[in-house]
Amino acid sequence: MQNDPIGLMDSGVGGLTVLKEVQRLLPTENTVFLGDQARLPYGPRSVAEVTMFTKQIAQFLRQQAGIKALVIACNTATAAALTTMQQTLPIPVIGVIAPGAQAAVQTTRNHRIGVIATAGTVKSDQYRRDILAAAPNSQIFSVACPEMVTLAEQNDLTTTHARSVVAANLASLMDKKIDTLVMGCTHFPLLRSAIQHAVGSQVTLVDPGLATAEQTAAILKTHGLLNPATTRGTAQFFTTGETAHFDTLASQWLDQQPMPAKHVSIAQLTTPMEVN
């Protein structure tokens, strides 16, 4: 089971930012990633629907790849489905919100923390709860930024248009005197330059991906699941969207030239499968 891959899932390609951190921290681990681009965005969807999608993807990754752990590399899906998945799957399940909240608490100096995320993540209030649980004197300012997800999926990251959209989305944070901003959607680290430009150098950006990779490593170690191999692990990719578009983004964002993604139809995800 140590050689089995770590599964990662996201509503689109944003979760590749988490995969990149996992590969950097755990280079010998095998991984398999599924981006559900055909059903993007998850943000406006109901908790029940996002939970159903997460269950379908987890079932697919277990059946197709025999994953030893699941990283929900999507803040919206983490907020909606993490507890359910942890209660129902016989493997470790890691989300991105708790690690991101903890990183924000460790980073802030004035305890004024901004959170940018999808509407679903903001509505869940999970970042606020997790931050306040660790630092009750914190003030949290959350903003839903769905247009920024679209920018990332379209690979529009550094243009004047991208900077304009990001600045408009973050305008309500400008008078809040935050010193820390959580990029509470895995797409947003791809827009780091535009985000930093909008909020200024005095604000520290927190990418939950690194903290999530660190938590994944710790959990695998606790369960005796770390891969003892000494060679670089393999990486498989699946998408419910267009494979050519996915491959272009993956090759641009990851440190290595990834193998081509395989297409998965929604029918494949919604058909019941036998999983041991």
Curated annotation (Swiss-Prot):
It comes from the Bacteria. Its EC number is 5.1.1.3. Substrate binds at residues 10-11, 42-43, 75-76, 186-187. This is Glutamate racemase. It is an enzyme of class 5 (isomerase). The lineage of its organism: Bacteria, Bacillati, Bacillota, Bacilli, Lactobacillales. The active site is at 74 (proton donor/acceptor), 185 (proton donor/acceptor). PROSITE patterns: ASP_GLU_RACEMASE_1, ASP_GLU_RACEMASE_2. Belongs to the aspartate/glutamate racemases family. Provides the (R)-glutamate required for cell wall biosynthesis. Pathway: Cell wall biogenesis; peptidoglycan biosynthesis. GO terms for biological process: cell wall organization; peptidoglycan biosynthetic process; regulation of cell shape. InterPro entries: Asp/Glu/hydantoin_racemase (IPR015942), Asp/Glu_race (IPR001920), Asp/Glu_racemase_AS_1 (IPR018187), Asp/Glu_racemase_AS_2 (IPR033134), Glu_race (IPR004391).
